[in-house]
């Protein structure tokens, strides 16, 4: 299903310059890749939300990590890195049981991999992360993704369970995009 035009335009505007201005000077293409990941997640939708009503779940997304008010640039960069890493490991294992179109899945995994390369090339010490312990933020995100993994296991990786996870990851990745834009605007 195609995203509404105004939503797509908003994603482009928010993502184009989202991380390029953080302390580590990520490439301009990083924000575009973020938009592409969101688009691919939307295109991967295979089931209508109504057909999976009995699968709804509150994964307790840690919104407080993405409000942009508490985090410094280096902390935001770390949160974005952990988030991207966890999404990659969720959708891109060597043997995926997900019911996705393989072409879309491969493109998603490629985009996430490129984003991780950008983030891992950023020297975190220069960004000030060496002085800023992020144990709580890291643990909170890991717990969130653990809940998602357990949900998939409990639901036997069914197509409806994957649809709920895809929608959840789309919302959380959008929050990551908003965080990146807020940090960029502070500069």
Swiss-Prot record:
Entries under PROSITE patterns matching the protein: INTERFERON_A_B_D
Glycosylation sites: 101
Compartments, record wording: Secreted
Gene Ontology process terms (BP): adaptive immune response; B cell activation involved in immune response; defense response to virus; humoral immune response; natural killer cell activation involved in immune response; response to exogenous dsRNA; T cell activation involved in immune response; type I interferon-mediated signaling pathway
GO annotation, cellular component aspect: extracellular space
GO MF: cytokine activity; type I interferon receptor binding
Keywords, in A-Z order: Antiviral defense, Cytokine, Disulfide bond, Glycoprotein, Secreted, Signal
Pfam family name, one: Interferon
CDD domains found in the cross-reference section: IFab
Stored InterPro entries: 4_helix_cytokine-like_core, Interferon_alpha/beta/delta
UniProt cross-references to SMART domains, sorted A to Z: IFabd
Main location as per UniProt: secreted
Organism domain of life: Eukaryota
Disulfide bonds: 24-122, 52-160
Cleavable signal peptide: 1-23
Family label: Belongs to the alpha/beta interferon family.
Role: Produced by macrophages, IFN-alpha have antiviral activities. Interferon stimulates the production of two enzymes: a protein kinase and an oligoadenylate synthetase.
Protein name as it appears in the record: Interferon alpha-1/2
